[in-house]
């Protein structure tokens, strides 16, 4: 029977075992090597506000961290950046303090300021002042950024005041007036619109068909919408009536014969006329040349005055009667048209007759003045 030969695994040389172990270790990344221990987390909670030593030996630098291969946390990175900022800040402060010290030494060497060294601040005070200045500059910049828009945005009042001061005030012409019935406050960015208050009266300059009119309010020219205003009717200025004004300035019609004779300066003939039947003005209107012959009034000036006064009285009375008839005839067609609208009756306003009566009054007053002038010229 065949027998199996015993294996010679145990008889292998130690050198071969060492080779195998080296191969395994190299292929499996050296598991036998001890693993790096994880950093121990302290039970006390880390706080950035705590005082951290600023010595180079106590604080790990970025180079040491890269050599060790340890991963730093966010807290450590913050600590490192803080320390680096402090170091750079100190260097800048030292450089500034040295420059300031040099300038102060130059100032102390001058004879004009012998006591400058006593009042000059030291480098430590300068460093504190510099740090405080940096802290103040940050909020100042933020304030400037926040208020930048306010400064840049133009206020509505400033632009309007500038325009009002430079632009001359509009004086006319105007095409009407309008009263505001609804308050309206325009946008602060709209410089052309007018601020309207109820009861304001606007002088209208232009009425375009678009609906936004142009007007003058409180000395300021601007636009406004017609829906906020009511157009005021234009004041109808009637034509002047010179006849009434002239009649007011002149004397009224005499009421008695004696008053008429006093005006023309012939009071001496009053008794003669009264005794011969001329008691009133109605009787005096019928005076003729034949009557003067019967009354034995032969003075040509007196005869002319008396005849002219009688004619003017007659014309004045006939004119007034015709004016009254004209007014009555103007009223009668209106009544008839109401009763029977089909009847066609010519209308008469009586304006023409009224003008003749006023003209007669003026002529009567003019003749009286002429008679008075003749009497004065004929007097010795």
UniProtKB/Swiss-Prot annotation:
Residues 318-327 have a biased composition (Acidic residues). The keyword Phosphoprotein applies. Pfam families: SAM_1, SH3_2, SPIDER. The modification Phosphothreonine is found at residues 61, 103, 112, 318. GO terms for cellular component: cytoplasm; nucleus. Residues 173-234 form the SH3 domain. Residues 252-316 form the SAM domain. GO terms for biological process: B cell homeostasis; B cell proliferation; CD4-positive, alpha-beta T cell differentiation; homeostasis of number of cells within a tissue; positive regulation of adaptive immune response; positive regulation of B cell proliferation; positive regulation of CD4-positive, alpha-beta T cell differentiation; positive regulation of immunoglobulin production. Keywords: Phosphoprotein, SH3 domain. The modification Phosphoserine is found at residues 27, 34, 42, 97, 110, 113, 120, 320. SUPFAM superfamilies: SAM/Pointed domain (SSF47769), SH3-domain (SSF50044). Residues 22-41 have a biased composition (Low complexity). Residues 1-174, 318-380 are annotated as: Disordered. Residues 84-93 have a biased composition (Basic residues). Residues 143-158 have a biased composition (Polar residues). CDD domains: SH3_SASH3. May function as a signaling adapter protein in lymphocytes. This is SAM and SH3 domain-containing protein 3. It comes from Bos taurus (Bovine).
